[in-house]
Amino acid sequence: MTFFVLFTFIFFNFKNGGVVLLGTVYVLYGYVGRISHLFYNFAYVYGDIVKQKTAVLNSEIIAKSFKERGAIKELRLYKKDWKVISVKKLDFSYHEKKGAEQHLKNIDLVIKKGQKIAFIGHSGSGKTTMLKVMRGLYALEKGDIYLDTKELQHKFNTISQNIALIPQEPEMFATTIRENLTLGLTRNTKTIYQFLDMVNLRKTVDQMPRKLHSSVVEKGVNLSGGEKQRIALARGLMAAKDKEILLLDEPTSSVDSGNEFEIYKNIFATYSDKTIISSIHRLHLLNLFDTIYFFENGKIIASGNFDELFETSLKFRNLWEKYKSKQSTSV
């Protein structure tokens, strides 16, 4: 930029028959240099300003969310305080626009304390969305939530601190197995191994050269998909120890069927007093659950225990027969 300005100045002076003094060029060079420096500094700082503005706006959204949640009087779910949570006529859309597609439609659920409940259905049927809504990750505009006979004015947000959600996709960090399990919290080795036993991973960890102190590469690329899921599941189960309701979003989808069955049996035995709701893909787990909700296109099309669904729902029978046939051909 500096040389362009100087060249233009000299060119037009000579063209018009003027005289170009060396001192004038030197002074002009100094001024143009300063202006250029200011221009580049502004461009650099402007980028930072945009980033900072974005960060401030995002933090305001988060702060507002915490403020709103802080205004909610948390309703603690003590052991003797509740018997059933009822969900009535719940609708939900990821889009706020009026008339947008509904991802959950007219959902009715009855969740009894201590029950083990399964959500089944094809991918995209609404299982994961329902779990996220129950955790309070999304606001509800339509639908009533009752704790026994008491209507919850702030829906699931009222009780969200009593609910833990363990997602399907495991998050792994570039640190040790132990740190991935505890996330820096103080946990004694006995407790850690208790949860490794629960997810059938103790033997695998003990076979590693440094056991709990073995390193995990970023994103867990040195672990199998099943190992990553079981580490994440053990971490989530440990963190959910004081929660009343546990939501599981296909946390063992990458684990082999035999291990998966044993893991669910272990979880249900250890957390027999907790209400556990799990979306599942492999139907061989269904007999472990008290109640099953069958999702399709954002709706619940059937519910009941395994025998009831098999008797009353043709779609469930077809799904079950298809699953059994697929399992027999893969053996």
Regions found by a protein language model. Name each.
Residues 61, 146-149, 178-218, 240, ...:
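ABC ATPase nucleotide-binding domain helical subdomain, centered on the C-loop/LSGGQ "ABC signature"
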Residues 265, 273, 282, 287-331:
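C-terminal portion of ABC ATPase nucleotide-binding domains
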Residues 246-250:
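Catalytic Walker B motif of ABC-type/P-loop ATPase nucleotide-binding domains
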Residues 1-33:
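A hydrophobic transmembrane-helix motif
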Residues 34-62, 72:
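Cytosolic ends of transmembrane helices, especially the final helix of ABC transmembrane type-1 domains
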Residues 63-115, 146, 151-156, 269-272:
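Primarily ABC-family ATPase nucleotide-binding module
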Residues 120-122:
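The feature captures the beta-strand-to-loop junction immediately N-terminal to the Walker
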